[in-house]
Amino acid sequence: FLWPYSGMMSGCVAMYQATGDKKYKKILEKRILPGLEQYWDGERLPACYQSYPAKYGQHGRYYDDNIWIALDYYRLTHKADYLKKAIALYEYIYSGWSDELGGGIFWCEQQKEAKHTCSNAPSTVLGVKLYRLTKDKKYLDKAKETYAWTRKNLCDPTDFLYWDNINLKGSVSKDKYAYNSGQMIQAGVLLYEETGDEQYLRDA
């Protein structure tokens, strides 16, 4: 499946950044990235990575899985091709945005039943990081909109932790996972750094 494979990619990227050891760069470029391309689905547009290798046919496409890969590509943007792929994944991710519930990104392209913090919080982070790299204000504007939607719809006002998702009927799944709140903390800090709006810092 794509999810554990992308975790291996994240780990290798982190090791390369932390140590500067070129063996990790070699592993990424010679093994991990070629393997990752086995998941690329260019038949359905916008193109993205699907959950299972494409040679086995079409499978589910998850917005959150593609966010993490796009973030890793962002961290590898010393090559133009990596930035190009990160932007392509960003475009796919935001194809999952809809006006239902006032906005927000769905979790799965084939199961548009609910909108999850795990699809929206890291999309905010990705948007700010792409803005920093490209200086294209559309990324910052969409990051601010995504952050505001997530905070309005999925933040528990009693403890400021984040619920898991809200379905299209307006019912909230109130499970709370550390990675959801953690991504919103990071998003708030990044937005504060780019806008100077102290409300983002207070939120974080």
Describe the residue ranges of each PLM region.
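Glycan-recognition and catalytic cores of secretory/periplasmic carbohydrate-active enzymes
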Residues: F1-A204
